[in-house]
Amino acid sequence: METERRIITSCSAMTALFLFMTALMASSSIAATPTQSFEDNFNIMWSENHFTTSDDGEIWNLSLDNDTGCGFQTKHMYRFGWFSMKLKLVGGDSAGVVTAYYMCSENGAGPERDEIDFEFLGNRTGQPYIIQTNVYKNGTGNREMRHSLWFDPTKDYHTYSILWNNHQLVFFVDRVPIRVYKNSDKVPNNDFFPNQKPMYLFSSIWNADDWATRGGLEKTDWKKAPFVSSYKDFAVEGCRWKDPFPACVSTTTENWWDQYDAWHLSKTQKMDYAWVQRNLVVYDYCKDSERFPTLPWECSISPWA
């Protein structure tokens, strides 16, 4: 989940408001029902004493202090599906703090891992959060995009979702597609699209003040600790990987998330996606010719198909 280029800009208030209203009016057929309790779905990865729940067990909190952060992962692996969670991010001065919500084929940063990332980059009080997304295939990432948001993600819960099938990866915020990452059989060797390895879903909070905020210029203010991110309403509709004969190797399309309508954006989603591209994109590796004099193969694939 490293990054090499840090660029931060902001969109105008009027543009953000317009997009917000557009998103509110957008319709979508995507739906998923929250599934069971935290204990049914997840294990704590480390620092259990930095994990708390609400009295009813429906809200889960991860905290970071100057000793350690905390993280959890699903008990099961999946290959393709719809994965969704509501998050409320660290409020106030969160510079240097990263909340990560991602899928990975390994429990750790292995050299051959596949990975699909949401990373929420904290900032000084009053400055906007930035969402960074990234995609890894066989240990190679460097496919960062960054977006600003049309709301304050620290004030309330918002839904962050991943649609993953063999045709596309789509990152959603409140049902609005902010990034579309396509597969293609026209690209040689397919060294860019993660479609072979099953993945766990993870979330964690950790200190990344060497790069997360203004390229590392803004450091974490530990006087403001603990920093807390909150979660609820995890939902998954995916193919659970079960050895030795996982059903996920099948090429059938019985599930909605792997049928034709899920292979591309709907007309309404394309409208929302177009507004995001025009107004909220902060950085796109496919447009960084200084970093990539020869752009990666996948940058030539249209997200609109």
Swiss-Prot record:
Reaction(s) catalysed (UniProt annotation): breaks a beta-(1->4) bond in the backbone of a xyloglucan and transfers the xyloglucanyl segment on to O-4 of the non-reducing terminal glucose residue of an acceptor, which can be a xyloglucan or an oligosaccharide of xyloglucan
Keywords: Apoplast, Cell wall, Cell wall biogenesis/degradation, Disulfide bond, Glycoprotein, Glycosidase, Hydrolase, Secreted, Signal, Transferase
Highest rank taxon of the organism: Eukaryota
Cellular location(s): Secreted, Cell wall; Secreted, Extracellular space, Apoplast
Site (Important for catalytic activity) residue list: 117
GO cellular component: apoplast
Example of a GO biological process term: xyloglucan metabolic process
Glycosylation site list: 61, 66, 123, 138
E.C. no: 2.4.1.207
Active-site feature positions: 115 (nucleophile), 119 (proton donor)
InterPro entries the record matches: Beta-glucanase/XTH (IPR044791), Beta_glucanase (IPR008264), ConA-like_dom_sf (IPR013320), GH16 (IPR000757), GH16_AS (IPR008263), XET_C (IPR010713), XTH (IPR016455)
Residues reported in the UniProt entry to bind xyloglucan: 119, 132-134, 142-144, 210-211, 215, 291
Extent of the signal sequence: 1-31
GO molecular function: hydrolase activity, hydrolyzing O-glycosyl compounds; polysaccharide binding; xyloglucan:xyloglucosyl transferase activity
PTM statement from Swiss-Prot or TrEMBL: Contains at least one intrachain disulfide bond essential for its enzymatic activity.
Positions of the GH16 domain: 32-231
Disulfide bonds listed in the record: 239-248, 286-299
Role of this protein: Catalyzes xyloglucan endohydrolysis (XEH) and/or endotransglycosylation (XET). Cleaves and religates xyloglucan polymers, an essential constituent of the primary cell wall, and thereby participates in cell wall construction of growing tissues.
Similarity annotation: Belongs to the glycosyl hydrolase 16 family. XTH group 1 subfamily.
PANTHER family assigned: XYLOGLUCAN ENDOTRANSGLUCOSYLASE/HYDROLASE PROTEIN 8-RELATED
UniProt protein name: Probable xyloglucan endotransglucosylase/hydrolase protein 8
Species of provenance: Arabidopsis thaliana (Mouse-ear cress)
Lineage: Eukaryota, Viridiplantae, Streptophyta, Embryophyta, Tracheophyta
Gene field: XTH8
